[in-house]
C-alpha cells in the first residue's frame, strides 16, 4: 500500500490493491481470461481492475466460485461501471452463462450500463455475431444471444419477479438500499442456480445502508477469522484522515482512488 510517485513530486498513482479485503487464496482464476478477452475487444483493464478480476473470479476444484458473494467498494469515477460492463460481456461470451440479472437503485443507472454494453457489442463484429435481439419495455430491458444466453436489466421493485436461476446477479448502487427486500428477492431467484454469484457494487454508505452494512459486518468477521466465503474488496482511505497535504493524506487519496494518475487527476 505505498504511494507510487511518477514523473514528479505532484503526480501520484492509485494503489491497485484494496486497503481492506477478505483473505486471498491460491485457487485458479478466470482473471487472466477476462483480461485477455477485454484486450481482444479493445479495452485494457487498469491495474486495480486486473487485480480485482484475478481475485474475484477464482473457483474451487469442483468448479464452484470461491466467493458466492462479492462486494466492490470504491469512490465514484474510478471505472466500476466499465468493469461491470466488461465482466457481464465476459460472462456472456467466454463463460457462456445463460442468465445474468442487473439492477440498480435508480433504473437510469442500470439503463445507462445496458446501452453501454449494447454499444460495445454493436461496434465489435465478433460480439455482434452472437447477438440476436434487444428487448425494451417499462422497467425492463434484455439482450439475447445465441445458445439461449440472456442479460436482463430490471427495475429494483420487480428485480426478482419471474426470474429463475440466474448464474450471476449484479446489484449496483448498494449504498442506497435501506432495507433487505430487493436483496432477499434476488437471492431467492438463485436458489436453483448450480453455481451462483452475486456482485454488489457501491461507493461508501451511511448508517441507513442496510444491505451494504450487513455485508461489511460479514466481511469484517471473515477477515478476523470467521468461517464465511464472502469476498469484500474495498478501496478507501483510513477513517479520520486529515486533509493536510501530508504523505499520510496522499496515501489515503491513492488508496481511495485506484484510478488516480490513470483516468483520475489528483485535483
State what each model feature region is:
Residues 1-267:
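Phosphate/NTP-binding elements of NTP-utilizing enzymes
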Amino acid at each position: 500500500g505505498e504511494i507510487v510517485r511518477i514523473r514528479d513530486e505532484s503526480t501520484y498513482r492509485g494503489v491497485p490493491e484494496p486497503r481492506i479485503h477478505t483473505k486471498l487464496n491460491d485457487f485458479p482464476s478466470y482473471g487472466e481470461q477476462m483480461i485477455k478477452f477485454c484486450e481482444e475487444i479493445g479495452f485494457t483493464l487498469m491495474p486495480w481492475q486486473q487485480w480485482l478480476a484475478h481475485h474475484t473470479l477464482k473457483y474451487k476444484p469442483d468448479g464452484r466460485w470461491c466467493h458466492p458473494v462479492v462486494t466492490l467498494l470504491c469512490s465514484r469515477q474510478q471505472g466500476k461501471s466499465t468493469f461491470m460492463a466488461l465482466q457481464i460481456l465476459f460472462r456472456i461470451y467466454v463463460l457462456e452463462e445463460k442468465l445474468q440479472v442487473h439492477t440498480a437503485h435508480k433504473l437510469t443507472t442500470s439503463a445507462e450500463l445496458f446501452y453501454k454494453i449494447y454499444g460495445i457489442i454493436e461496434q465489435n463484429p465478433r460480439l455482434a455475431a452472437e447477438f440476436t435481439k434487444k428487448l425494451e419495455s417499462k422497467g425492463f430491458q434484455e439482450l439475447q444471444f445465441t445458445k439461449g444466453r440472456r442479460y436482463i436489466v430490471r427495475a429494483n421493485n420487480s428485480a426478482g419477479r419471474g426470474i429463475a436461476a440466474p448464474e450471476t446477479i449484479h446489484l449496483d448502487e448498494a449504498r442506497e438500499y435501506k432495507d433487505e427486500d430487493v436483496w432477499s428477492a434476488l437471492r431467492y431467484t438463485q436458489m436453483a442456480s448450480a453455481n451462483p454469484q452475486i456482485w454488489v457494487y457501491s461507493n461508501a454508505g451511511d448508517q441507513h445502508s442496510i444491505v451494504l452494512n450487513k455485508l461489511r459486518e460479514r466481511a469484517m468477521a471473515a477477515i478476523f477469522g470467521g468461517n464465511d466465503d464472502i469476498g469484500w474488496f474495498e478501496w478507501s482511505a483510513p477513517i479520520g484522515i486529515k486533509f493536510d497535504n501530508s504523505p499520510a493524506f496522499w496515501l489515503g487519496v491513492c488508496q481511495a482512488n485506484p484510478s488516480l494518475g490513470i483516468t483520475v487527476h489528483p485535483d
